[in-house]
A protein has these predicted regions:
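Conserved SAM-binding loop
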Residues: 5-6
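A short glycine-rich, Lys/Arg-flanked "PGG" loop and its adjoining helix->strand segment in the class I
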Residues: 52-67
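Short, glycine-/aromatic-enriched active-site segment of Class I SAM-dependent methyltransferases
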Residues: 74-94
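Conserved catalytic loop of SAM-dependent methyltransferase domains
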Residues: 111-128
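Conserved SAM-binding strand-loop segment of SAM-dependent methyltransferases
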Residues: 12-26
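Short alpha-helix
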Residues: 96-111, 117
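A short SAM/SAH-binding and catalytic strip from SAM-dependent methyltransferases
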Residues: 35-49
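A short acidic, Gly/Pro-enriched loop at the edge of an enzyme's catalytic core
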Residues: 25-37
Length: 128
C-alpha cells in the first residue's frame, strides 16, 4: 500500500507528501509535525474504547493551524447488536459507526474547535 501511495504521489507530481504504516492509536511522528491529515473510512474500524485516543493522536501530531478531513459513516442513534456484530457490515465501515454526538465529544476532548460537518446521506440505510 505504501509503495502504491508513493507511486501515485510521484505520478501526480507531489513532492511534499509522505506515507507511513503505523497504528492509528500510536503514530510514530513528532508532535506538531503534520500539516494535513486525511482519514477515509478508517476510524470506524477502531474499537470504540480507542476512538478518543485516535483523535488525541491526530491533535498531537497536527501543526498549529493544520487541517483534518475525516470521512466516516456516523449513526444518528445507537446501532443494534445485529448490525454491530455483523462482520460484513464491519468490513464495510458500518458496524463500527459512532454516533454523531460521540464523534463531536471525541473531537472536542482532543481540543479541536471550528469543526464543520457535511452530511452526505440523510436517510437511513437500515430500516428502523
Amino acid at each position: 500500500m505504501i509503495e502504491l501511495a508513493n507511486k501515485n504521489a510521484k505520478s501526480s507530481g507531489l513532492s511534499n507528501t509522505s506515507f507511513i504504516e503505523a497504528s492509528i492509536t500510536s503514530i510514530p511522528l513528532p508532535d506538531s509535525s503534520v500539516d494535513c491529515i486525511i482519514s477515509n473510512c478508517v476510524i470506524n474500524l477502531v474499537p470504540k474504547n480507542d476512538k478518543p485516543t485516535v483523535f488525541q493522536e491526530i491533535a498531537r501530531i497536527l501543526k498549529p493551524g493544520g487541517r483534518v478531513a475525516v470521512s466516516d459513516i456516523l449513526a444518528r442513534k445507537e446501532l443494534p447488536g445485529s448490525i454491530v456484530n455483523d462482520m460484513a457490515l464491519y468490513v464495510g465501515c458500518v458496524a463500527g459507526a459512532s454516533q454523531i454526538a460521540e464523534y463531536e465529544e471525541y473531537l472536542q476532548r482532543a481540543g479541536f474547535e471550528g469543526m464543520a460537518y457535511i452530511l452526505s446521506q440523510k436517510e437511513s440505510i437500515f430500516a428502523d
